[in-house]
Amino acid sequence: MPTVGIDHIAMPTANAERLLTFYKRLGFLINNEDAWRQGKVTTFSIQVGESKINVHPEGYTASLRGPTAVPGCTDICFVFEGTVEECQKMLQEAGVTIIRGPEPRAGGRGRCTAPSLSLYARDPDDNLLEWMIYQDMPTAKP
């Protein structure tokens, strides 16, 4: 299959500063933050592995977007490399409240057959965030 991954998703925010603080506390790298602060670009992004989350700050409306692209509309699952306990510790140290989990889930690896556990939280815009921890970390392609 020629489509092999996700390059980026877009996420609107009601408060860019609050969102930046939240994701930086979790250890994410921010792309174009300085250029955004200087007014050279209209958006910044959160790096996630080889993919990114394009953040649309308050007041910015993308010309191409989903019909319900408003703060809080995003539901995203991150893959965490480590144990459930390490993920819980990372979230707790960042001041993030776990709202559910750990519980078994079927992720995309192994065409939904790889055993995994997930933890759930929300960011400052109330987006649903999931951290999936694969038990065997398989890398088989479909």
Predicted regions and their residues:
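N-terminal beta-strand motif that seeds the catalytic metal site of vicinal oxygen chelate
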Residues: 1-18, 26, 74-76, 132-142
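A short, sequence-level motif marking secondary-structure junctions
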Residues: 57-62, 136
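Active-site/binding-pocket entry motifs
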Residues: 52-53, 61, 97, 104
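Short secondary-structure capping/turn micro-motifs that flank functional sites
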Residues: 39-40, 62, 107-108
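Core segments of cupin and vicinal oxygen chelate
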Residues: 4, 11-59
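Vicinal oxygen chelate
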Residues: 2, 5-15, 44-47, 65-142
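Short histidine-centered beta-strand/loop micro-motifs
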Residues: 33-35, 64-69, 110-112
